[in-house]
Amino acid sequence: MAIKKFKPTTNGRRNMTSLDFAEITTNRPEKSLTEKLSKKGGRNNQGRLTVRHQGGGHKRKYRIIDFKRNKDGVAGRVATIEYDPNRSANIALINYVDGEKRYILAPKGIKVGMEIMSGPEADIKVGNALPLVNIPVGTTIHNIELKPGKGGQLVRAAGASAQIQGRDGKYVIVRLQSGESRLFLGTCRATIGSVGNEEHELVNIGKAGRSRWLGKRPTVRGSVMNPVDHPHGGGEGRAPIGRSGPLTPWGKPALGLKTRKKNKSSDMYILRRRKK
């Protein structure tokens, strides 16, 4: 999809950009694959704020996505490519020959009418899903499982991709988008190709109200809060932090402190750390 620019008819539209949605073929989702999505506003079941900057936004329905891609040996055809308000990537509706319908993440280059397949015998073709052990070295992949049968958990955002680097016994070495090289069990599945809608990151929101439509609330600096709300708060006028270094709202060191748990069980599968 191309980036659409606007004339500066107002200050809010001066630098605003948007996707032109040329790839989208329908604006109505498949009703059987949607369900109610109630807003939480970043609160937990006690009503306490656990995730900041969430709240409001346009009403949405959740689209049920097939991340497992476990319909082996049954051919499916791409019926539509649709917008999904719950993720940065677009989604594709697949009509299988046995009558079932499923949504998948729309890979780059997929078109209406294309045929896709899942399983160890599937061709190495964009949109097909196979176990990692059946995918040749150097192939670009996305929607990667961490545990066999659990469904894809990694490389699902718009424009994201990973690459098969090699094999090591029952494991496959995959280079992720972050630069990290990691071992995955060969029986874990992945989908061929990269995720579509790669221009998503180039969109300029343009104005605060558009962020509110997306359900994003403002981010307030700690230095303009009261001392009760943030370690940087208080003082007369623009006061310095008054600490040896910047802190999070909960009093823990910020900016540069490593937060990954030491001796994490998955450390043994990471061959090369991600780029800084």
Swiss-Prot record:
Residues 28-57, 219-276 are annotated as: Disordered. Pfam families: Ribosomal_L2, Ribosomal_L2_C. PROSITE patterns: RIBOSOMAL_L2. InterPro entries: NA-bd_OB-fold, Rib_uL2_dom2, Ribosomal_uL2, Ribosomal_uL2_bac/org-type, Ribosomal_uL2_C, Ribosomal_uL2_CS, Ribosomal_uL2_dom3, Ribosomal_uL2_RNA-bd_dom. Residues 28-38 have a biased composition (Basic and acidic residues). GO terms for cellular component: large ribosomal subunit. Keywords: Ribonucleoprotein, Ribosomal protein, RNA-binding, rRNA-binding. The keyword Signal does not apply. One of its GO terms (biological process) is cytoplasmic translation. One of its GO terms (molecular function) is structural constituent of ribosome. Belongs to the universal ribosomal protein uL2 family. Part of the 50S ribosomal subunit. Forms a bridge to the 30S subunit in the 70S ribosome. PANTHER family: LARGE RIBOSOMAL SUBUNIT PROTEIN UL2M, RIBOSOMAL PROTEIN L2. One of the primary rRNA binding proteins. Required for association of the 30S and 50S subunits to form the 70S ribosome, for tRNA binding and peptide bond formation. It has been suggested to have peptidyltransferase activity; this is somewhat controversial. Makes several contacts with the 16S rRNA in the 70S ribosome. NCBIfam families: rplB_bact. This is Large ribosomal subunit protein uL2. It comes from Exiguobacterium sp. (strain ATCC BAA-1283 / AT1b). The lineage of its organism: Bacteria, Bacillati, Bacillota, Bacilli, Bacillales. The gene is rplB.
